[in-house]
């Protein structure tokens, strides 16, 4: 074979190798928590119908949210014995700052229960795959009732669903250190407690929202409408506020706003 043809054949082989490698890498990049943001629209649009590439989000109450993936995986955050869904989720996450964030008697039909604190085997570090959902956690500390600190007593759970990264802060008691932010990665939707008392002061929670820089933040854990409105007044000059007009929204990457926005979802039962 002439040398010129051999050179062409070698180039073709190298090109094919590159194409194969890219094909293998692309799905992993799409599933990660640092996706490109160029496709974010200028305005958040709320949908009411589940579709491929979307996440159904329902605010059950207090710190419990029901997330449903395109593949039908049902997740309930801060699953507890006070505000329970009328169905059995596939996955339940819990934290233990207060009994309203965990259950002593979870539904035996739940397939995966993730307790976000040290239950006797050390601070948990979850990396779980369930159906089309990836779940991990970032451990944080909480104040103890008698004073002092319980290290790793709370977990920020991160749910990677439909090309969105959703972080639920649960009962966060402090602003985030650089190592927490590095573990979190790029977050698209932040669910944040705004009570201003049992977790963080509202100004400190505002600082956490600034730290995370999520396009969308959903307030939770506010107990009463007045507490929520106090928080919205505090942030009014810094973030636009949209109200869902109900307890349910459907989110997708294309719906994320370019400007960081606060989205208020009404709890089904108690804030």
Predicted segments with their positions:
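Short, conserved loop/helix-junction motifs that constitute active-site signature segments
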Residues: 84-87, 105-110, 183-186, 208-213
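Bacterial N-terminal signal peptides that target proteins for export
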Residues: 3-16
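Short, aromatic/basic amphipathic alpha-helical patches
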Residues: 106-107, 227-238
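Proline-aspartate-enriched helix->loop->beta-strand connector
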Residues: 189, 196, 205-219
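N-terminal signal peptide c-region/cleavage motif recognized by signal peptidases
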Residues: 25-26
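Core dinuclear metal-dependent hydrolase active-site scaffold
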Residues: 31-91, 99, 115-185, 189, ...
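Extracytoplasmic/secreted cell-surface and envelope-processing proteins
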Residues: 102-103, 176-178, 198-203, 226-230
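Histidine-centered divalent metal-coordination motifs
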Residues: 90-110, 221
């Amino acid at each position: 074979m002439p040398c010129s043809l051999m050179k062409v054949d070698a180039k073709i082989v190298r090109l094919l190798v590159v194409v194969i490698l890219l094909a293998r890498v692309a799905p992993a990049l799409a599933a990660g928590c640092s996706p490109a943001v160029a496709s974010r629209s200028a305005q958040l649009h709320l949908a009411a119908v589940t579709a491929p590439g979307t996440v159904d989000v329902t605010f059950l109450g207090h710190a419990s949210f029901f997330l449903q993936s395109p593949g039908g995986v049902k997740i309930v955050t801060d699953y507890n014995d006070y505000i329970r869904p009328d169905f059995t989720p596939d996955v339940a996450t819990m934290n233990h700052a207060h009994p309203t964030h965990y259950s002593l008697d979870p539904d035996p039909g739940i397939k995966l229960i993730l307790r976000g604190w040290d239950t006797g085997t050390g601070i948990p570090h979850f990396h779980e795959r369930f159906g089309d959902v990836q779940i991990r956690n970032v451990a944080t500390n909480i104040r103890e009732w008698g004073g002092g600190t319980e290290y790793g007593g709370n977990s920020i759970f991160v749910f990677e669903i439909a090309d969105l990264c959703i972080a639920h802060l649960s009962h966060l008691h402090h602003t985030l250190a650089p190592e927490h932010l590095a573990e979190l990665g790029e977050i698209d939707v932040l669910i944040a407690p705004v009570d201003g008392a049992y977790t963080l002061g509202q100004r400190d929670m505002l600082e956490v929202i600034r730290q995370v820089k999520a396009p969308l933040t959903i307030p939770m854990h506010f107990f009463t409408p007045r507490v929520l409105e106090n928080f919205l007044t505090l942030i009014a000059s810094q973030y636009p506020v949209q109200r869902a007009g109900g307890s349910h929204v459907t989110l997708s990457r294309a719906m994320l706003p370019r400007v960081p926005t606060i989205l208020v979802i009404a709890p089904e039962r108690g804030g």
